[in-house]
Each structure stands twice: as structure tokens, then as C-alpha cells.
Amino acid sequence: TPVMANEFSFSFEWGDIPLCTSGHPNIVKNPKFVLSNVPEHTKVISFRLKDLDAPSYDHGGGKITYSGNNEIEPGAFTYKSPCPPGGSHRYVWTATAKEKDSFFGGTIGKAKAMKLYPNK
């Protein structure tokens, strides 16, 4: 879906994670995320990775305290790397912007970004 003007969005690159196609993921540092149009009053952004071709597998994610920096460098959190057996899978990161560091409520924006892995 196209991104509307001023809509919360982000991009990412897999970076230098080890190639993994065994179905047994590694624990790796987050990719670099570049954020755009982060909602006003955002204090925390949580990131979750989902494999659209194996949606029941929990790759995890993490959260960062947002202070206005729109580049999130690798190492902010760790997660289970993409590691599809038998070909590329479609992976989606979801970023959830919150105005408070709370599991319940406070969500003020969501964005998604998808890439294949491996991206051959």
C-alpha cells in the first residue's frame, strides 16, 4: 500500500546478519531502521518481526525510547533472525509508536515494512 503524506513509516536493511536458511534462527542485533513522520508525543517505539510465510513462529523484537532520532542503529535490541528453510520468505517489521511505556494503551501510530529473506 502506498504511504500517504505525513504518515508514520520506516525502512530497514537486513545488514550484516549471518546468512541463515536452516530453519534455526540466530539471535542477532536489530537492523538499522530509518523512521519518517513519527507521531508527535511518541516516547517509545516497539518493533516486532513476523514471517508472513510461517506466521506462528515468534521472531520477537524489542523497544526503544524515542527522543527524536529517526535512525535506529543496530544493537538497540536483539531478535531471532530470519532463517527460512527452503527458499525466501516474506518478513514484516511492525513499529508501534506509543506516548507512554505501557503494554496497554497509549498507541498513537503503527507502521509496517516488508522485505524478502534471503532477498535473492
Task: Name each model feature, range by range.
Residues 2-120:
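N-terminus-centered regions that define maturation/targeting leaders and the start
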